[in-house]
Design a protein with these regions (language model features):
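A general secondary-structure signal for short beta-strands and their flanking turns/coil
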Residues: 36-40, 55-57, 93
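Conserved, non-catalytic sequence blocks in retroelement Pol enzymes and Pol-derived host proteins
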Residues: 29-35, 48-52, 108-115
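Short, ligand-facing micro-motifs at secondary-structure edges
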Residues: 22-29, 85-86
Length: 188
């Protein structure tokens, strides 16, 4: 890891801890030896109030390259019961399609090195709103087809997934109960 990436990620962690938006989590993953992996962060984005995603707690991962912050982190939602989040702008792998985390000149990317992790997470939360879906940039065929051809069926599927990732819901975790590779979701 470069010195710039290391110092920037440490600064991002300090800043996030000081001004963490309610319900959000962003912290380096824990390695088997107990140390922190600054290049891989486990995050939680709460569904925005007043949207279909309200009440959901969506686990995701941010992976940083050694040239961060020159390049954006790769952001992806954890799978929910082995399936991607039912959203037209989320790839089947869980990767999030959002201009703020795409390099400039790539797929309408608007990434700048000054973009903070907190801003990324808030933008991802905003994407979890039916009004913010970008049908011109479909990443997931099934979700796109439902969204454009049978909106009620799409809403039903979203509500089912939200129920799976709502604390106290069917599983209480975004990865089907186990919390995925990073363990259970723990809000700090």
């Amino acid at each position: 890891m470069s010195g710039l990436a290391n110092s920037r990620l440490k600064e991002e962690r300090r800043n996030f801890r000081k001004s963490r938006p309610f319900g959000f989590v962003a912290k380096p993953a824990t390695l088997p030896d107990g140390s922190q992996d600054l290049m891989r962060w486990k995050c939680v984005v709460p569904g925005k109030e007043g949207t279909l995603f309200e009440g959901g707690v969506f686990a995701m991962t941010m992976v940083f390259d050694s040239d961060y912050p020159q390049s954006p982190p790769k952001c992806s939602f954890d799978l929910i019961d082995g399936k991607p989040l039912c959203h037209p702008n989320v790839y089947p792998s869980g990767k999030i399609c959002l201009s703020i985390i795409n390099p400039q000149g790539s797929d309408g990317g608007t990434w700048t090195p000054s973009t903070q992790i907190k801003v990324i997470l808030l933008a991802i939360q905003t994407l979890l709103d039916e009004k913010e879906v970008n049908p011109l940039s479909p990443a997931q065929t099934d979700a796109y087809q439902l969204f454009t051809k049978d909106r009620e069926a799409w809403r039903k599927r979203v509500r089912e997934q939200v129920a799976r990732v709502t604390p106290g819901g069917a599983t209480g975790s975004a990865s089907g109960g186990s919390g995925g590779p990073g363990g259970p979701i723990v809000l700090e």
